[in-house]
Structures are given as C-alpha cells and as structure tokens.
Amino acid sequence: MTHNDSRTLQDLAVYTDCLPDARFSQLIHLFTLQHFAALQADRFPFYRTTFWYPSDRQPETLFERVIEDLRPVVRPSAEVVGVEWWFSVLNINATPQWLLPCHFDRNDLDERDVRHIVFPEWASVLFLNAVPYGELVVTDQVINNADKPTPREPGVMRFVHPSPNQYALFPGQLYHGVLGRMWRPMQPNLVRVAMAVNWGAEKPKAGYMRDSREAMAAFDLG
C-alpha cells in the first residue's frame, strides 16, 4: 500500500482468542517466555531478526502455520505476496516513556522519498502474554511528503492492552508504537512478548531479513 491508502484508524480491529487453542498452546510451549527472556538477557537482536514467508508456498514451520491460521481473519487482498514477521520483546520497565517509539512500518528503512515508500497492506500484532502496561498504540497519523507524521499531533489514538492470544490488525500506513508505564505505579518487571505480522504487496529490503524457514535455528529452538 502507498501513502495514498484511504483506510483509517476506524479499520483497526481486535480479536480475542484469535488462534485455535491448540495452536496457541503449541506456540507458547515451543517458544516459552523463559526462552524469550534468556535470549533478551543475551542481547539477542529481536528487532533486527525478521523473516519473510511468501504466499506462494505451503507452511513448513509452526510459525508459518500460525500465520496461515491468521490469514482468514486478515483476508489480505490478491496484491499481498507474503508476510514479514518478527518477535517484539520488551522489558516493561525499561523506560517509563515509550517502550517502542511511534514509527511507520515500511518496505525500505533507508528510503526517504515518500513517493517510493510502500507500507504493508495490513500490520498486525499477536500478543503472547499479559503485562500491566505496554499497550500497542495506533494513531490516526499518516506520513506526509516530508517523511513526517501528519497531523503533527494525533487527533485520535487507540490503545490495545496485551492479552494472551489477542490479535490486533490495522492498516499498515498508520503511525504506531508501544507505551510504557507513564503515570502508572511501577509493577514487577516482565517481558512483553508479541509476534508482529505484516502482510505486504512487496518484499521488504532489510538486509537482515531471513527466510522464514530459518526461524527455528535463529532462535535456537532445535
């Protein structure tokens, strides 16, 4: 999708208990919260470890089967040629401000000419666990010709609180991030884990992106 996409924040949808129980159980037993925490303690680069799963082949891993379970919920258009996915792993007390600053997902992080930027058709987040804060925040802001969010300040914001097996789906051109505790009392530190799934009409250009079939080895899951 280009920056001329007419969809808005009103198209954001949240689905509870989205995956079949058996599939979600498989996912959290394969990749446990303890394993996520151990990798993070070793400074594993979660945000520079992304994967591409093309639409023209059958699923071969559990992660790809999860994506196929999400497909009928998303109902991507025929323009979507694949999915970029990764795990978002954040310590909820890393900062009281934004755990992940607001940003635009795009096909090329180095491209500054807005005319050439392609956004996912749909961006989405599958939450794996519950935490007291760390909400996904999606705003009504889109990109302008100066590569900045417009309007300058959001007119409307939607907050999605993490809950196991909850799935948030929103137009891929919208500005979004992850909120810290802000004004709220500090709670015991937890790791917030979510699977980000972007449905795109173009394969992103990130040099660190891998074939989706390499995920098991990348995460040392055997």
Regions flagged by a language model, labelled:
Residues M1, L221-G222:
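Non-catalytic N-terminal targeting/anchoring module and adjacent flexible stem/linker
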Residues T2-S88, N93-L100, R213:
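Non-heme Fe(II)/2-oxoglutarate
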Residues E79-E84, S88-G180, P185, N189-A196, ...:
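Catalytic core of non-heme Fe(II) oxygenases with the double-stranded beta-helix
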